[in-house]
């Protein structure tokens, strides 16, 4: 008999209890006429619920967060943090230094100027391991973006995800110890020209010239020196080179480095020069800086240094290249160097090519045409021979810099290692006189009495002073408590016994005579009236104490706010803590001359690729306007004209019968305990259609009085600009040749003495 297994029925005890009560109730109802029974039903208590089972949940760390932490550290080039995230097995396989070098090598070889970016694509997580798929983009300045999808494997160690590292985490192609190698494609560097197309810098053959002084025949020496002077257009003078030859000859006949010259410039003289005993010519090919023209504007190139190799590699440069270091060579690197290209190879550990990872072509370099006028620039450089100082010449109505000279100057060709004279002369570039320092834009000087232009503007704007305001200009200023200041006329009286004080002057006459007491009074008066910042605010409105925006390196100077009555007097005449650059001064003097517009100065006229279609052409940029009325500006202009035209003007005797309309201001800025700086600034208003009017600033460090030294140079620059030649300075026998270390002093009757503080 087949047994049938009945299904088990499970009935909860509570249901059985309820069923029993119901049965008893029915039974009682069926007992006829039995006496009624009142029953109170009390249910049994419910069984207590079972306690909740104890469950411990162990959470797995966020896989994506771990991957992002690693990739973010890579993006930030935080290699120590990346290494700290590796598994112990990975750390055992590669040291931190080797790990770091892997990433740095890729960044350098691939020229990752902008680093990397990444994107998480997906993830897969198990209790003990995980995989994260990500896309990495390497941004190469040479071959463009390199994009790869890669897998990161992670292991759980001590409750944290750790990266299982191998080379493929950088790029899949680097698996197995492969590495990258860049084959650079470098366009030829473009030239730099003056505004008229004359080459200032170009690739060409050159020759280093030197003398074996022991072999030079003394009876031929003068002829040889004169030939060198002609070859170098007067840059090297017999009176300078001759004593050097004698000194070297008398001390063993050593080799004397003389100069270098472009091969085509040497050609007409080469046969004659080679005929002199002791002359040594060493040819070389280089990026040649013609005639050392405007080296502080053009700049120079030099080799990449050891500590720069990695940084420059990231920018697409080979370790053995030369780069722009200053001036336009630095500013215009992206134009002059062109767009570099390259082929990025994957190489196996034996050095064999595995594949080409990326490739790009070059784009041609672009020439820079400067605003400089070659002949005017050479004239400005010659005018500074024997001085330490600077000259700036700007187009009065556009801000274009026509000449910018700084002295002492330097020869950029000495940075060329194939120049035979380089190793012997390059040390001179780092002497105490700092020839590499651009005094025109980086030199910061007290402005002296030239600053009175600013103070006069502040006085007129205040409403307290008018052109008719007068002041008795005596020898002394005694408005300060317990301090007496002396006018320049008193200092001269102590020397010559006859210079008289200027007497009663109107405000414009005060500028014409450069009366210190008048301007001391203005500074103190404005300060005492609570107009503490009137002069400093005006100075900033004239563009001082801020960058001009020119393309090359510059300093901002300093315009202080007076903190005491004595400060207020010092600041009013451009002394105290007042500092300016010659470029700033030329810029604001141009604004005074053009009606009040401050232009952003520039040395770049246009940028031109090989096809001849400029990618940039200069247009004037207005920086601001002088914060004075046209009426007040006219008053200042007239006063500056009187500095030159009025017989009592401090520069009158420098411009006798001068054919060009000019306005200016002398300045002699005290620099104790040394001699003062000589200043002269001014502008022309000739209005010739073929020659735009100019503004000029001249400063000579610790040279003396502005009227004696700087004013004649200003006059010569104006002559050269308009006529192509200049007269001889008082200290010269001919242009560029000094006759004495100081100019002769011409006695002039008072009050025509020209010294100004």
Pin down the residues of each PLM region:
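Short hydrophobic alpha-helical segments used for membrane anchoring or interfacial signaling
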Residues: 391-396
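Short solvent-exposed beta->alpha transition segments
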Residues: 49, 55-58, 64-65, 69, ...
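Extracytoplasmic/secreted envelope proteins and their assembly/folding machinery
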Residues: 64-71, 79-87, 96, 100-103, ...
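Beta-lactam-recognizing serine transpeptidase/beta-lactamase-like catalytic domain environment
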Residues: 346-357, 397-449, 454-700, 706, ...
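Extracytoplasmic/periplasmic proteins that interact with beta-lactams or build/remodel peptidoglycan
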Residues: 34-43, 119, 123-390, 410-439, ...
């Amino acid at each position: 008999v087949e047994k049938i297994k009945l299904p088990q029925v499970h009935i909860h005890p509570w249901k059985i209890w309820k069923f029993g009560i119901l049965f008893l109730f029915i039974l009682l109802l069926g007992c006829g006429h039995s006496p009624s029974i009142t029953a109170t039903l009390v249910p049994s208590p419910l069984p207590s619920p079972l306690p909740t089972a104890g469950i411990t949940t162990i959470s797995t760390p966020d896989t994506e967060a771990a991957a992002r932490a690693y990739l973010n550290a890579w993006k930030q080039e935080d290699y120590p943090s990346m290494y700290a995230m590796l598994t112990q097995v990975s750390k055992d396989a590669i040291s931190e230094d080797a790990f770091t070098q892997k990433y740095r090598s890729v960044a350098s070889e691939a020229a990752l100027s902008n680093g990397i970016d990444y994107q998480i694509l997906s993830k897969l997580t198990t209790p003990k391991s995980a995989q994260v798929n990500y896309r990495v983009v390497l941004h190469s300045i040479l071959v463009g973006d390199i994009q790869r999808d890669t897998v990161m494997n992670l292991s759980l160690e001590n409750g944290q995800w750790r990266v299982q590292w191998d080379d493929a985490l950088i790029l899949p192609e680097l698996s197995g110890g492969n590495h990258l190698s860049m084959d650079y494609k470098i366009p030829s560097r473009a030239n730099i020209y003056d505004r008229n197309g004359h080459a200032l810098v170009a690739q060409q053959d050159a020759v280093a010239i030197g003398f074996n002084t022991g072999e030079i025949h003394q009876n031929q020496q003068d002829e040889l020196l004169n030939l060198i002077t002609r070859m170098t257009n007067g840059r090297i003078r017999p009176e300078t080179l001759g004593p050097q030859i004698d000194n070297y000859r008398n001390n063993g006949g050593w080799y004397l480095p003389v100069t270098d010259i472009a091969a085509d410039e040497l050609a007409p003289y080469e046969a004659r020069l080679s005929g002199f005993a002791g002359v040594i010519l060493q040819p070389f090919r280089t990026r040649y800086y013609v005639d050392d023209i405007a080296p502080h504007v053009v700049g120079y190139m030099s080799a990449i240094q050891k500590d720069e190799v990695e940084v420059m590699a990231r920018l697409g440069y080979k370790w053995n290249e030369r780069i722009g270091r200053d001036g336009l060579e630095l500013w215009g690197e992206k134009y002059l160097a062109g767009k570099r290209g390259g082929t990025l190879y994957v190489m196996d550990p034996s050095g064999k090519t595995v594949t080409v990872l990326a490739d790009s072509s070059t784009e041609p370099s672009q020439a820079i045409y400067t605003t400089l006028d070659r002949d005017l620039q050479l004239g400005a450089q010659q005018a500074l021979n024997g001085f330490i100082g600077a000259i700036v010449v700007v187009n009065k109505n556009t801000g274009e810099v026509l000449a910018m000279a700084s002295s002492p100057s330097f020869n950029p060709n000495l940075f060329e290692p194939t120049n035979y004279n380089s190793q012997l002369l390059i040390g001179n570039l780092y002497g105490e006189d700092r020839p590499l320092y651009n005094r025109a834009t980086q030199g910061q000087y007290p402005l002296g009495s030239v600053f009175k232009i600013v103070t006069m503007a502040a006085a007129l704007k205040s409403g307290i002073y008018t052109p008719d305001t007068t002041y008795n200009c005596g020898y002394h200023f005694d408005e300060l408590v317990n301090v007496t200041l002396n006018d320049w006329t008193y200092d001269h009286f102590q020397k010559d016994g006859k210079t008289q004080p200027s007497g009663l002057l109107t405000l414009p006459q005060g500028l014409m005579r450069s009366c210190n007491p008048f301007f001391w009074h203005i500074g103190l008066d404005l300060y005492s009236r609570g107009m503490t910042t009137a002069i400093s605010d005006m100075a900033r409105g004239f563009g001082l104490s801020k960058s001009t925006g020119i393309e090359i390196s510059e300093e901002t100077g300093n315009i202080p706010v007076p903190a005491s009555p004595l400060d207020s007097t010092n600041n009013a005449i451009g002394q105290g803590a007042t500092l300016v650059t010659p470029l700033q001064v030329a810029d604001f003097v141009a604004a005074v001359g053009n009606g009040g517009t401050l232009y952003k100065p520039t040395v770049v006229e246009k940028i031109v690729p090989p096809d001849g279609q400029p990618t940039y052409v200069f247009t004037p940029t207005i920086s601001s306007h002088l914060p004075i009325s046209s009426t007040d500006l006219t008053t200042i202009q007239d006063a500056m004209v009187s500095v030159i035209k009025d017989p009592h003007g401090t520069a009158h005797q420098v411009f006798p019968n001068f054919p060009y309309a000019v306005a200016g201001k002398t300045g002699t800025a005290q620099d104790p305990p040394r001699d003062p700086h000589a200043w002269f600034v001014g502008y022309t208003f000739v209005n010739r259609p073929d020659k735009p009017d100019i503004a000029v600033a001249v400063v000579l460090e610790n040279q003396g009085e502005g009227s004696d030294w700087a004013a004649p140079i200003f006059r010569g620059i104006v002559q050269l600009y308009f006529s192509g030649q200049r007269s001889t300075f008082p200290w010269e026998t001919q242009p560029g040749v000094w006759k004495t270390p100081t100019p002769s002093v011409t006695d002039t009757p008072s009050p025509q003495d020209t010294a100004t503080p």
